[in-house]
Amino acid sequence: MGGRFIVFEGVEGCGKTSQMQLCAEWLQSLGISVVLTREPGGTELGLDLRRLLLQKAEDKPIAEVTELLLYAADRAQHVAQELKPKLAQGKYILCDRYVDSTIAYQGYGRNLDMNLIHQLNDIATGGLTSDITIWLDVDVEVGLARKRGDNVGLDRIEQETIAFHRRVQQGYADLAASSPKRIIRVDGQLSKETVHKTIQEILSVHLKQWL
């Protein structure tokens, strides 16, 4: 059985982390070997980069292009050290964010050059794309309200303006429209149980082809 790469995407507070965990437990109950990972931070180097990227904005300002390059460095290490080897072992990888996050956040949110972003993504991934991407779609204000309710403080990205987060949301909508077979929209504002059931139904269709 070959490995599969399943990515979870969405704006802040969309519920990716909890849905990934529920999905992992469900897949494991089917006898599938699952790996949970994330970007940034899927390797030891990535954890250091994550601390730099997500520290509060007032601590150490990061230039926008620097931010883009740090995300690319995190991804290149992640792909080489974790993703490709685990897929070669037949693992099912559930990943919290991947290339679409860079397009949505740095491309749409920061208005950085999209050609540069695609070039860096191509270099960092070595051509590795997701088998399927689950986009948990929530209104940005709902998502940010969820994050504030966590009582853990907002990180540098979460502290951005509503206008920034709305541009990111538009980025995801455009990506889903341009890649409807790879990116599947799920209404993230439904109950946790309903969202999980929807994801199960989506993946069940693919599992019939994969297993």
Swiss-Prot record:
Catalytic activity annotation: dTMP + ATP = dTDP + ADP
InterPro entries referenced in this protein's UniProt entry, alphabetically: P-loop_NTPase (IPR027417), Thymidylate_kin-like_dom (IPR039430), Thymidylate_kin_CS (IPR018095), Thymidylate_kinase (IPR018094)
Enzyme Commission numbers on file: 2.7.4.9
GO BP terms, alphabetized: dTDP biosynthetic process; dTTP biosynthetic process; dUDP biosynthetic process
GO MF annotation terms: ATP binding; dTMP kinase activity
Residue ranges the record marks as coiled coil: none
Keywords linked to the UniProt accession: ATP-binding, Kinase, Nucleotide biosynthesis, Nucleotide-binding, Transferase
GO cellular component term of the entry, any: cytosol
UniProt keyword Transferase, yes or no: yes
Binding site for ATP: 10-17
Gene3D superfamilies to which the protein is assigned, alphabetical: P-loop containing nucleotide triphosphate hydrolases (3.40.50.300)
Role, per record: Phosphorylation of dTMP to form dTDP in both de novo and salvage pathways of dTTP synthesis.
PANTHER family: THYMIDYLATE KINASE (PTHR10344), UMP-CMP KINASE 2, MITOCHONDRIAL (PTHR10344:SF4)
Family from the record: Belongs to the thymidylate kinase family.
Protein name: Thymidylate kinase
Organism expressing this protein natively: Nostoc sp. (strain PCC 7120 / SAG 25.82 / UTEX 2576)
